[in-house]
Amino acid sequence: MYDKGPVPGRNDACWCGSGKKYKKCHSAFDERLERLWEEGWEVLPRTLYKTPADIEGIKRSAAINVGVLDCVGEHIAAGMTTNQIDQMIYDYTVEHGGTPADLNYEGYPKSVCTSINDVVCHGIPCDTDVLHEGDIINVDCSTILDGYFSDSSRMFCIGEVSAERQRLVDVTRASVEAGLAAVKPWLPLSVMAEAVQKTVEDAGFSVVREYGGHGIGKEFHEDPFVGFTTEAPDVDTIMAPGMVFTIEPMVNAGAPDIKISKGDGWCVRTKDGSDSAQCEVQLVVTEDGYELLSW
């Protein structure tokens, strides 16, 4: 059944911290989720829906997260190494009171993932990866502030890029916009996934299946897994107000198949050597749609 935890009395204070009586606040919310669960939909445990205080905490974290990517955008250029990007992100985050969430996460050695051209995700910064004119790169960073996590990534084009690479980046961004437009409370994740998948595949590109978005807030990766195809796991999960997750499709110019580096165990590349792009935003579902938290 729907895990709604301890249920307050109808006249007791609501579990969300609003100060309102439960019957005037989240009583109907809990009842609606329970009905949806009984109908066969997936619903998150109550503890994964964020309270107003949680959202404010995530927003403070996200302000650093957005700021650091703005900083990267101002300085990234041909001739820069990915290690220099990593140092920039570490310095900015720490100077603003945050902690890079990637650093030492499950053994990951850096503060950011830098994924160039055919690298799908989890490229590890180093001194030998030098940006060249015509490259495309995804910079994916995550931030912790006061126990709250934020996460986003952006694509950067280094100088003049080929028409093919520019189109891949543009379609990837458009797929995220299509996904956002499909986010509505009380609908399943599948409607968002379908919008992303259609945008990508109509353009002749493919969506990576093995990686996707995720819930996030008080932990780096929370349920649900957020896939971007209609057959992905958890697509029957209902998007309810207070749910925080990321939309971050990884889009390949060729086939969706990937391979993981046997050397570092992290770097993911396209199996056929085609280019890949990714954009990531973090949002909270609201009563009438969504609010962007980081981008």
Task: For each feature predicted by the language model, list its residue ranges.
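Conserved N-terminal segment of EGF-like repeats
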Residues: 1-5
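Short cysteine-rich clusters marking metal-coordination/redox-active sites
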Residues: 14
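Active-site neighborhoods and metal-handling regions in enzymes and metal-associated proteins
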Residues: 6-10, 18-295
